[in-house]
Amino acid sequence: MNIKEMAHTSHAGLVITSLDEGDVTALTSDYLLNQLHTHGYLILRGFRHSIADFSERVRSTSSRISLDPARSFDGDTAQKVDAGYDKVGLHCENGNSPFWPDLCWFYCQKAPTQGSQTTVCDGKAVYEHMNAAQRAAFTSQDIVYSRRVDEKKWKTYALHALAGQPGAPTTIDDITLEHLYAVAQSDVGMRIDKLDDGAIRYSFQTPAIIGSRLNTKETHNFANSIFGPSNNYETPVITFADGSPIPDTLLAEMDDLCESLTVDVGWQQGDIVLIDNTRVMHGRRRIEDKDRTIFNALSYV
């Protein structure tokens, strides 16, 4: 296979281009993950592409797939990005919940003709540019996300997350709260309360500045979901761990800093983007081309 590697920005990202329309599934997982360790996100460009190729690429690099049942499916791996047309703030995918995957993938089946770009922001670079007061504010205590989730949504999520595992429940009626705990990260600060109507309210405590799960040397990344969306779910309440709100002035400062380090993917037809979801945040410019078609997948190494 004939490929060319080129930096996407001066501080993060790598574009891996096939010069002969090669098979994207022929790239080894070790090669991709090693490059991801260094660069934070990858853009695979110029390869032969289809939903089937994308799904196979995701499965071969992952130990487990995470599906959001609130989105539309294309097979058992890819889901269509359908989060309306407005701008989407920077976030780690599912970073406001204890179901936070390692890897975030995108596949561009049809590139936008104008605007409508997915954006990326390297949390490592953000941390390096934070001033002492900003670092102190976010390292002195964790942040907490809390919200209510309807019974059907949390049970459907658990059903999909456990699918294929030995002894997994086969219908939504078999799902219990223990099943939901089973698919959460075991090392997170999580509390789940079941409500009278079968819904749950969860709280998830996590640092705003975290270490990458993929590269243990990258210990300080401003990677979180304090600016992120809540499509298909109730908007979470976001506070510091002591219950105090994050000051508007601090949020505005961080928003400006992150925006200064945010870049567009620059979609081309057939692109696949792979993101370290514990280092690099992503978002979206306002949709101007409603015919663009992007698929997403979430997974664990």
Q: Where on the chain are the PLM-derived regions?
A:
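Active-site environment of non-heme Fe oxygenases that use a 2-His-1-carboxylate facial triad
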Residues: 1-23, 84-90, 99-272, 278-301
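Catalytic domains of carbohydrate-active enzymes, especially glycoside hydrolases
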Residues: 34-41
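Short, acidic/polar
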Residues: 24-33
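Catalytic micro-motifs at enzyme active sites that drive phosphoryl/nucleotidyl and oxygen chemistry
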Residues: 31-32, 89-97
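Residue-level recognition of conserved beta-strand edge/terminus positions
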Residues: 45, 276-277
